[in-house]
Amino acid sequence: MSAFEVYRRKFKPALPRAIQGASYHLHTEEKTHPVADEQDIAALFPKTTHLPLLDIQPDTGAPKLLEPKRVGVIFSGGQAPGGHNVLCGLYDKLQQIAPKSVLLGFQNGPKGLMTNKYVELTEKFLEPFRNMGGFHAIGSGRDKIAKPEDFDAAAKTAKDNNLDIICIIGGDDSNTNACLLAEDFLKRGLKTAVIGVPKTIDRDLYSTKGIECSFGFDSSTKVYAELIGNICYDCLSAKKYWHFIRLMGRSASHITLECGLQTHANICLVGEEILSKKMTSRQLFEYLADCVTKRADSGKNYGVCLVPEGLIEFIPENNELFAYLNNTLLPHWTGELTADAVAAKLPDPLRTTFMAIPASIRTQLLLDRDPHGNIAISQIETEKFLGAGVQQVLRERGSKTKFTPLYHFFGYEGRCAAPSDFDCSLCYSLGAVAAILGCNGKTGYMASLRNLVRPPADWSPIGLPLTCLMNMEMRHGHKTPVIMKQMTDLNGNPYKLLARNRDTWLMNDDYQNPGPIQQIATESAEGTAVCARPTITLIEEARK
């Protein structure tokens, strides 16, 4: 264990004032409704739809200790900084409100739950993982509880281990699984409560009803922003490269937007804006070429451009092209597969779209296929797609502008980072909220916290019904209940802050280097230290 890890284990995560002790009460608030498709959701989830929101408030009465509980917990999906503190917060709160409770960590995600593979999480077991990054205490996985036999297996595990609670720590798909499992257990008459915890660095698991920020977003964006800040200063020092930096976020641009606000990169592309303007690939290349040319005209043949990894899928014409290739043309293809041969077989509008894609990327599209033979959109290097597009436009214009692109992808660097103070306390508090909800027999709820721009003592713990996040979407040709992903709000304050400063940041070298995550308080006043500051996104969203 490194000197840093030894030091970091000593940090004491903060809890909201309402749940610092063992005296609290659950206040029932308004009945909730699904975010869309209410009739369909209510028909599929008759036992958990329209549950009330629960506000956990402090109680001045004597602590009411509960009987020991048997609790299972899993990580589901990709890693995010702070996950281990959810386990620690869950364990510590269980021992406080239901002494001698047993916590079982099912290994490697939902598969561990279905196969009954677990390790008991004790004080001694958890000690090395407090305030540490990663999910390696019990591992994670992307298996889904989807088939009837999967639900049977999960129910068998719950019964065999006499579980009172199962806590699922994951993103939108994982919490959709939690919602399905809660409903299934109620239909079976099982006593096991199912509680979800919101995890995703992408921050597409968000709700105005009570999810202000999923854990991991704070730490990961601060890691990426540090790296981007370093590149900005390198860019300013060398004055000869354009850096195209792809950032995680296939479905939403929250990470890219936050990093742009932290670093003042010259260009920060927001996929949702491109979608709203119905931009074509060619229009995007033209815009970027204009930006490069404007800076070059000012003697600046360098810059930094931030790109969400899912950008290509925000361009409407690309989705039409990919759908036609995957569903109509490629399944019946015979003979040599070349870009020219494919172009000759495409109808006119789609041929134009295909030929607007740089030649090197066209070849990659056809060669990189998933196991089903479809174009592997997630494998497209978006930053190179844009850089090649700019080169193509400049070449067609006969421009003498000097343009030397360099490419970066920041993704896995941030998923298992040592969590920030914010994420340490957020995760620890989420674990505690999950324990309270489950120990009080609540099922089909997500543990959450409000007022996150305040110091942790002022955070408001709540239980949010999972069904109020649900809608129906087409998956594999069928309408399926899922938690709705939340995209970047183009009417929201964070985006407006970018829009107001976009032209200035493009032309000026107004770079900011936020530096590494600060983990030592430098001011005495609570909440004023650099290490205590939340993201700019949260601060801006809290502004009225």
Swiss-Prot record:
Optimum pH is 7.2 for the forward reaction and 7.0 for the reverse reaction. Monomer. The active site is at D202. Catalyzes the phosphorylation of D-fructose 6-phosphate, the first committing step of glycolysis. Uses inorganic phosphate (PPi) as phosphoryl donor instead of ATP like common ATP-dependent phosphofructokinases (ATP-PFKs), which renders the reaction reversible, and can thus function both in glycolysis and gluconeogenesis. Consistently, PPi-PFK can replace the enzymes of both the forward (ATP-PFK) and reverse (fructose-bisphosphatase (FBPase)) reactions. The record marks K199 as: Important for catalytic activity. Non-allosteric. Competitively inhibited by fructose 2,6-bisphosphate. NCBIfam families: PFKA_PPi, PRK07085.1. HAMAP family: Phosphofructokinase_II_Long. It catalyses: beta-D-fructose 6-phosphate + diphosphate = beta-D-fructose 1,6-bisphosphate + phosphate + H(+). It holds the Pfam family PFK. It comes from Giardia intestinalis (strain ATCC 50803 / WB clone C6). This is Pyrophosphate--fructose 6-phosphate 1-phosphotransferase.
